[in-house]
Amino acid sequence: MLHDMLAAVQGNAARYFRTKLFRMQNRAPIVSFTFDDVPDSAYTNGAAILEEFGVFGTFYIAAGTCNTKGAYWNVISPEQVRVLHDRGHEIGCHTFSHADLKKLSAAETEVECRKNHNLLRRICGDVQLTNFAYPHGHVSLRRKLQLQKRFDSCRGVIQGINVGTIDLGLLKVVELFSRSLTPEKLQRILQETCDHNGWLIFYTHDVTNRPSEVGCSPSLLRSTIETVQAMGLTCVPVRDALRLIGYPVA
């Protein structure tokens, strides 16, 4: 019980202490589409739909889970990861085993990231993992401070648009979930992004006609991209969005 209480305090600290501040310098609003865990449908449907519109996404992969089966989806295969990379999509880090970072030491976290990078380099060749997403959205303040040094950005699951001076240690997102993203909400969020010259990061998981609670249908993904492009918004992966906001990407 005490351990759980301490973990909750650490998690709240990670959320409320902005630790990697950067003032956005983008000239126009930005939208990024990201996929966590990467079910195989995010490859077969998600990536294919993005490519229909000339859009590239960021796919946060825990390579140790490739080819595994869960309660809601089958995880992408190593070959599919390689194809995503070869087609120009960004591969992001999601730890090796989709670990709960609140429960890991600094050494264990480093091993998770190193193993993931090493395996993805064997799969993809020259891939560089420069951006990270916290598995389950969980992170302690200590692990946040550790990971923000290793990666250009770390993304969570806290809802919101990234505007003005942002925390690159805990980027905000908007759920691209069929259960929660209505046309009215989409229009409101996109208008807010335009009004504040923001960076809107969508995140989802599976892309199927019967999505999980944390996934979306192909029609929702397609209509979202259509709406974004109709408003003239720039759609780029996280790595390219960082350049557009003026972050000194290597």
Question: For each of these PLM feature ranges, what is it?
Answer:
Residues D4-E90, H117-R122, Q128-Y134, Q191, ...:
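Active-site beta->alpha N-cap acidic-glycine motif
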Residues S32-F35, G92, Y203-T204, C235:
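Generic enzyme active-site microenvironment
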Residues T193, Y203-L221, V238:
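C-terminal active-site rim and adjoining tail of enzyme catalytic domains
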Residues F56, E90, S153, W199, ...:
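Residue-level detector of anion-binding/catalytic polar loops
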Residues N45, L50, K69, H98-C194, ...:
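Catalytic domains of cell-wall/extracellular-matrix polysaccharide-remodeling enzymes
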Residues I91-H98:
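Histidine-centered catalytic micro-motifs
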